[in-house]
């Protein structure tokens, strides 16, 4: 009964929808020492619920056949099922889930005693981590259960996943807001207490603190409220202070009790703050160079005469010698040539400040003219609609 207080939804509604979309639905319910059975065809019961035997076990078996009258395709994608069942096993430590694909005689068993700790470990597999996984569970006074696991790694991306009663919220919500507030407060307090901010002469932001962070936030909330029927954002106001209070207490204690981990995390944050500041300065410098100012690209870009981007082409060639040949053979009216030195930076794996400090990348950004960064990138300003 306690499980149903924080269930993800009304199970009867779910099975009713499945029934309406199935050519056949078969139910076996083991309850109170008896085995009950009922079957539906295209939503209509074939007989009343009946007792077909006795049992010592409890549980429900639901079998359904998707209706070909409703769906154009009724083939199950086992990867989608595996991803969700694995997720549920992580979220419910100790629950064993078995997925069998009898079409190809394949079986997956999901059983994670470590719960969210193993979830973080799974996500961070193959990455270099900076601290051991921090994991706690707490029950608050207003009946909200809070569970958090997190770990920093050497990547530059934030990966935080939020769940309410096992349902994922891709748009976050009040649980994410409480988590972020407590995380930032705890780290800022540590940096101030250790006098790190004054020593390093930097100002850090919440984004700096979350660079390279992998975290799972799972809350159990009686009667949760969401922004829409799809439950993609939690809006229950009582959840934010519950998560913030629990996280603040546990995380502050973790930083005090694990000085080496705290030092590694602080180093990561300082690096992120410096990189952000360097990127800001580089953006300002790039912004000052007009994309139409050919003086900004001395001896590099051989622009075309055409001013309409839809009719203009840009050819990226390797090296000045190839650039010279390309310039001689081009159609000056519509074809521009931009020579670049050899193998330029792999921007997918580079930090933003390193990417923007690369001369070749900077040349390319200026020539294309559409800007960089979330605030300034505008594809409508692209100077060439064909880039080769």
UniProtKB/Swiss-Prot annotation:
Site feature (Interaction with DNA) residues: 343, 346
Q: E.C. number, please?
A: 5.6.2.2
Specify the Toprim domain's residue ranges: 312-388
The reactions it catalyses are: ATP-dependent breakage, passage and rejoining of double-stranded DNA
Annotated keywords: ATP-binding, Cytoplasm, DNA-binding, Isomerase, Nucleotide-binding, Topoisomerase
Q: Which GO terms describe its biological process?
A: DNA topological change
Which EC class is this protein assigned? isomerase
Which Pfam families does the record associate with it? DNA_gyraseB, Toprim
One GO MF annotation is: DNA binding
Q: Where in the cell is it found?
A: Cytoplasm
Name the domain of life this protein comes from.
Answer: Bacteria
- Gene3D superfamilies in the record, alphabetically? 3.30.230.10, 3.40.50.670, Histidine kinase-like ATPase, C-terminal domain (3.30.565.10)
The answer to whether the entry has keyword Cytoplasm is: yes
| Gene Ontology, cellular component aspect | cytoplasm
Main location (coarse class)? cytoplasm
Similarity remark: Belongs to the type II topoisomerase GyrB family.
Query: Which PANTHER family did the record assign?
Result: DNA GYRASE SUBUNIT B, MITOCHONDRIAL, DNA GYRASE/TOPOISOMERASE SUBUNIT B
Q: What does this protein do?
A: A type II topoisomerase that negatively supercoils closed circular double-stranded (ds) DNA in an ATP-dependent manner to modulate DNA topology and maintain chromosomes in an underwound state. Negative supercoiling favors strand separation, and DNA replication, transcription, recombination and repair, all of which involve strand separation. Also able to catalyze the interconversion of other topological isomers of dsDNA rings, including catenanes and knotted rings. Type II topoisomerases break and join 2 DNA strands simultaneously in an ATP-dependent manner.
As a miscellaneous remark, the entry gives: Few gyrases are as efficient as E.coli at forming negative supercoils. Not all organisms have 2 type II topoisomerases; in organisms with a single type II topoisomerase this enzyme also has to decatenate newly replicated chromosomes.
Quaternary assembly: Heterotetramer, composed of two GyrA and two GyrB chains. In the heterotetramer, GyrA contains the active site tyrosine that forms a transient covalent intermediate with DNA, while GyrB binds cofactors and catalyzes ATP hydrolysis.
Record protein name field: DNA gyrase subunit B
Q: Which species does this protein come from?
A: Acinetobacter pittii (Acinetobacter genomosp. 3)
- Which gene name belongs to this protein? gyrB
